[in-house]
Amino acid sequence: MSRELPSSFDGKSEFDEDEMDILEKMAFKCKQQPLVPLGVIATTGAIFLATKSIRKGDRVNTQKYFRYRVGFQLATLIALVAGGYMFQVESDEQKATREEILRAKAKVRERLWIEELERKDEAMKSRKKRLEDSRAELIQAAKEGFEEEKKWTDAIENAKEEESAEGNDNKDVSN
């Protein structure tokens, strides 16, 4: 059978954060709180512009970009806290949903596992039956062969006895 056995590692659920790799997890978190990545990008841009103005020697713009950086970091922090507060209620609902999904997934895996065991059991029973049938056929063929061989050996022995009896009769007649 080339069919694969069910496994506890089959498939990935959207809510299964433990089974996600780092990029999938980042994308999932960005979808949950979309303002945080925007704040991070804005902060990074402000730092980049501040670095550029430092190289030019422009102190006024450097101070302005560093102030923007602080403002963007504050906005990111506020978005993070507000998003955490807003998603806390949703998180509890997600936990309940995740538990239900995991229970359903476990039931499906158990059902698939039981079906696979039943298939294997049926295959084993059919192999056993074929083996018993072929063994019975082999025994029957052997019996028939032995009976046929016995007939031939009996016929040969009878022919030898008849020859020896005829030979003895000829010796008696000649004496």
UniProtKB/Swiss-Prot annotation:
Subcellular location: Mitochondrion membrane
Region Disordered, annotated ranges: 147-175
Keyword Ion transport: no
GO cellular component term, pick one: mitochondrial inner membrane
Key words, A-Z: Coiled coil, Membrane, Mitochondrion, Transmembrane, Transmembrane helix
UniProt-recorded name of the protein: Respiratory supercomplex factor 1, mitochondrial
Functional summary from the UniProt entry: Cytochrome c oxidase subunit which plays a role in assembly of respiratory supercomplexes.
Recorded coiled-coil stretches: 90-144
Membrane topology designation: Multi-pass membrane protein
One Gene Ontology term from the biological process aspect of the record: mitochondrial respirasome assembly
Residues covered by the HIG1 domain: 7-98
Assembly mode: Associates with the respiratory chain complex III/complex IV supercomplex.
Signal sequence range: none
Family: Belongs to the RCF1 family.
Disulfide bonds: none
TM regions (residue ranges): 34-54, 70-90
Chief subcellular location: mitochondrion
